[in-house]
Amino acid sequence: MESSSSSSGSALAAVDPQLQHFIEVETQKQRFQQLVHQMTELCWEKCMDKPGPKLDSRAEACFVNCVERFIDTSQFILNRLEQTQKSKPVFSESLSD
């Protein structure tokens, strides 16, 4: 039994590059869908007083502004995380100090 678990571990290490790419793409899609869901929920709660047969101009402007601010904020956070990640020393380098 131990040999099968070690062989499955080595099989995971040698995953087909196409499969890895597929998994990465699907993970990105899932993250995007989660982001859209969060944005929709947040903006709906903020902008929609009472659902009606037609979206009034105030609600439409609120939705547009909400979505733009959500995207701006998300982009700002991603950029800040990227800067922070680049400025941190590599873990192995910090151990050698």
UniProtKB/Swiss-Prot annotation:
**GO MF terms, alphabetically ordered:** identical protein binding; zinc ion binding
Q: What is this protein called?
A: Mitochondrial import inner membrane translocase subunit Tim8 A
**What is the source species?**
Rattus norvegicus (Rat)
- Subunit field text: Heterohexamer; composed of 3 copies of TIMM8A and 3 copies of TIMM13, named soluble 70 kDa complex. Associates with the TIM22 complex, whose core is composed of TIMM22.
> GO annotations under biological process?
protein insertion into mitochondrial inner membrane; protein targeting to mitochondrion
**Do you know which Pfam families this protein is assigned to?**
zf-Tim10_DDP (PF02953)
Q: Would you tell me the Gene Ontology cellular component terms? A: mitochondrial inner membrane; mitochondrial intermembrane space; mitochondrial intermembrane space protein transporter complex
* Range of residues in the leader sequence: none
Q: Where is this motif: Twin CX3C motif?
A: 43-66
